[in-house]
Amino acid sequence: MLKQGKMDFFVTFNNVNLTYFTGFSGATALLIPKQGEGTLYVSAVNYEQAKTETKGLAVDLLKRGENLMQKIAAKTAPNKLAVDSLSIESWRSLAKAVGGEEKLETAGNLILELRSVKDQDEVKLIREACNLAEIGMQMAFETVKPGVTERRVAAEVEYAMRKKGADGTSFDTIIASGISSAFPHGSCTNRTIHQGDLVVVDLGATYQSYRSDMTRTFTAGKSTEKQMKIYETVKVAQQKAFKAISPNISAAQVDGAARRAIEAAGFGEFFVHNLGHGVGLEIHEAPILSPDSKDTLAAGNVVTDEPGIYLPGYGGVRIEDTVLITSNGAERLTTGYYSLETLR
């Protein structure tokens, strides 16, 4: 970005981007020059840890009372800076320090685009996060039954993942049962699961800052014919989308493959969200798989494939996998538990 543009430095204050570039999450800012060594700015509480955990960077201690913007200006003057993720107030403060807004330029979506293509090390971490998610889903499969509360299921799921090495969850675990399963982002409550309920389980694990995302739908007991029809429709839609995923295809085309399958079964109006999104250091990243997405998929993208049908007052079904886009197609990083019933 620096070599191709008119900027001489890039500076980021964004916690996620700081982790992406340095592997260290406790920094305040990172300054990268067009040539030479970058500088990581940290407070005293993180100084020794930063020196130990970061390589190839100068670590600059921010002493109490020092002005970060002025320190950056002193190192970059009289050059121009590309800036990422800054509040209006901080932008103005930095502009004042460097001598005017004409010295600054937003980095726009360049960093998001860079992060959307994962390297081998990132894929390895995401793969492990997905393995941990599968452990959580196994526990959900074993725990979902009449008489158990949603929060009990969530607690068992999260403990199972942490016990096997997860740093935490990718997001608040969703266990949505009964009519609440018709809420795409339903919360986890103390509701008791009843016989015959549809139960949507949406979970993910974090491993060394990288995330996974996986959803399955179960019934607590024997499924009805209507539940099975909805489930099989979603399952077919997910498979259609998965088969469509490949490098250089538009994200909108992949969304369309799933959406057409659901529409053909008569449930089109009940598929109310996008098909998927990128996954990495954040649970929602580029690219976006939606009907109006302008994104084109690329090898190294990690995305979700998560069609769903949600009938208000009745219940819903969603099936979701985390998917790696390869040079010639796609690979599911989460697998298993594609059966609706939890009790045989």
Model-based region annotation:
Residues M1-R344:
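Active-site neighborhoods and metal-handling regions in enzymes and metal-associated proteins
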